[in-house]
Design a protein with these regions (language model features):
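Extracellular beta-sheet-rich ligand-binding/adhesion modules
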Residues: 1-203
Length: 204
């Protein structure tokens, strides 16, 4: 697909089929509730914007060296229980530029250090968040978005308050008991740090 894609009927995709966006023009994608088996974003220095929520059951793939991004706006991108993401890097990723989130669903199971990297960033900087989940999942999901701003609830009275990131990740976990999670976010040291990097502390 090199232009816009709007599903006005019943769209059925099965592995190993995929919906692939390519070309140099920006595209809009409206799935109207259909679940896509595999979705590839291989635009040439351009974007794919969701105009409603989208669901992927297989692989969300970004083409290497294409400088292509998916813009969520107010819409969620849902990755199913068996879904994965590949090819994301500093030039190819999901932009959480409004209220939309990347949601990863989990099979009902007990997990120990189950790793998944959310391929998110803002309009200009790739800021993935890796989740290492432990706990028992039942109808579970984790939602993630990144915001290029000072965290609004950041402590300002502690001695370390003069050193902080001007970027934060919002994480919402649902349906997980005995929940623990090691979260590792990537940020840009030249753009995102105020003060001294060694004094920056994370919080939840």
């Amino acid at each position: 697909v090199q232009g816009n894609l709007t599903n006005n009927a019943t769209l059925t995709t099965q592995a190993p089929s995929k919906v692939k966006f390519s070309g140099a023009a920006n595209s809009n994608f409206k799935s109207n509730g259909a679940t896509i088996s595999n979705l590839e974003i291989s635009k040439n220095n351009s974007t794919v914007t969701l105009t409603d929520a989208a669901s992927v059951s297989g692989v969300l793939e970004f083409g290497s060296g294409t400088s292509s991004k998916m813009l969520l706006g107010a819409n969620n991108l849902v990755l199913g229980t068996g879904a994965s993401a590949s090819g994301h890097d500093a030039d190819e990723y999901v932009v959480t530029n409004s209220t939309g989130v990347v949601q990863k669903n989990y099979t009902d199971n007990t997990y120990t250090n189950q790793s998944f990297t959310f391929p998110v960033g803002d309009a200009s900087i790739y800021s993935p968040l890796t989740s290492s989940l432990s706990g028992t999942a039942s109808g579970a999901n984790i939602k993630v978005k990144v915001t290029n701003a000072d965290q609004p609830n950041r402590a300002t009275t502690l001695p370390e308050a003069t050193s902080y990131l001007t970027r934060y990740w919002s994480v919402d976990a649902t349906g997980i008991t005995s929940y623990s999670n090691v979260l590792t976010g990537q940020y840009n040291t030249s753009d995102d740090i105020v003060g001294t990097a060694a004094r920056v502390k994370g919080s939840s």
